[in-house]
């Protein structure tokens, strides 16, 4: 009886919006659902493929500009990012006000790092959004699951907005077969002019491995292999791995001869240009040396649950679609609490029903 009452209360308070904050699904690469506009000086600029998250605490965003094309210093404090539906009504789904911190220069490019000064989210009605924020604060009070990252309320809200843009969950390969590692990453973004930005937790071994190697290979995961991202997450804390024990076959990348998964949809080989310790993370700016597309298919991605709720609300059969998409997310995360399986024979590829990820 008590559980039934709780279910009714949840249904009234949250409707169909009580989803995991990190929601996984498959989408074409590159994503075509969201456009990010930089506003506050002249005509808005499309920076969808020119920005990257830098750090969680303090939450920091990097935006890339062509050399000499950055906004004037007098306008920097008035800039904002608007996250908009790319098609349809082109609805504004969220906005982050920006506060400039520092500038980094590389050949032909300038990168400005910002922290949030404000954050607005329009994916859910205001009342329902406030209910979610209260629930989030209560859960944080009861059980701190932030893994040592302390974020302000503004930073948490801005982080939710950033992940309205679908983020690919990629596998990072570093080193050689004799002394190397492979682990997942989803804090990354293109910065323009062949540059890429990505971030790794500063206290974990993976960040040091990448900095010392100076070059890595980034592999796009097909949706059917998404669970591997969770199975390999513990490799962030390892100096090296035994590649022969991975549950999948590998091949060598074309430019740097780094082991990468045979099933990769796309492999980008990048060379580190600069590294900066910023709060909880190490931020890397890298130059793309080679970009190989091997096959088409849905790429394994993550979005925020608020945005998934907005996506589902547009569908006629919302309740059924909710169940289906939740089943797909749970299927993708089934490796989260499992140790990495030891390879005892040919890897079995489990094909995911395309209807399970919406």
Q: Where are each of the predicted segments found?
A:
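Basic, polyanion-binding surface patches
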Residues: 2-358
């Amino acid at each position: 009886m008590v559980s039934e009452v709780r279910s009714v209360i949840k249904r009234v308070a949250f409707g169909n919006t009580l989803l995991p904050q990190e929601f996984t699904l498959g989408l074409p690469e590159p994503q075509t659902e969201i456009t990010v506009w930089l506003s506050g000086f002249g005509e808005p600029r499309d920076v969808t493929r020119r920005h990257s998250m830098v750090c969680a605490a303090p939450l920091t965003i990097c935006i890339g500009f062509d050399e000499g094309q950055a906004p004037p210093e007098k306008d920097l404090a008035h800039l904002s990012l608007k996250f908009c539906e790319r098609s349809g009504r082109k609805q504004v789904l969220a906005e982050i006000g920006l506060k400039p911190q520092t500038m980094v220069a590389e050949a032909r490019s300038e990168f400005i790092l910002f922290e949030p000064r404000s954050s607005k989210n329009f994916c859910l009605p205001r009342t329902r959004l406030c209910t979610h924020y209260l629930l989030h604060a209560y859960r944080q009070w009861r059980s701190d699951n932030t893994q040592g990252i302390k974020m302000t309320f503004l930073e948490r809200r801005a982080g939710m907005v950033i992940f309205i843009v679908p983020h690919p969950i990629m596998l990072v390969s570093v080193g050689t077969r004799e002394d190397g590692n492979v682990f997942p990453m989803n804090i990354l973004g293109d910065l323009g002019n062949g540059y890429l930005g990505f971030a790794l937790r500063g206290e974990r071994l993976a960040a040091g491995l990448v900095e010392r190697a100076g070059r890595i290979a980034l592999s796009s995961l097909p949706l059917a292999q998404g669970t591997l991202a969770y199975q390999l997450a513990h490799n962030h804390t390892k100096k090296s791995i035994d590649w022969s024990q991975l549950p999948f076959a590998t091949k060598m990348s074309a430019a740097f001869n780094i082991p990468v998964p045979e099933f990769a949809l796309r492999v980008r080989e990048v060379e580190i240009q600069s590294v900066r310790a910023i709060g909880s993370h190490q931020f890397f700016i890298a130059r793309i040396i080679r970009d190989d597309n091997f096959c088409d298919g849905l790429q394994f991605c993550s979005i925020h649950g608020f945005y998934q709720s907005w996506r589902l609300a547009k569908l006629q059969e919302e309740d059924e679609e909710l169940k289906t998409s939740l089943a797909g997310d749970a299927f993708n995360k089934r490796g989260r609490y499992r140790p990495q399986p030891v390879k005892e024979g040919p890897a079995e590829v489990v094909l995911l029903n395309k209807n399970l990820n919406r």
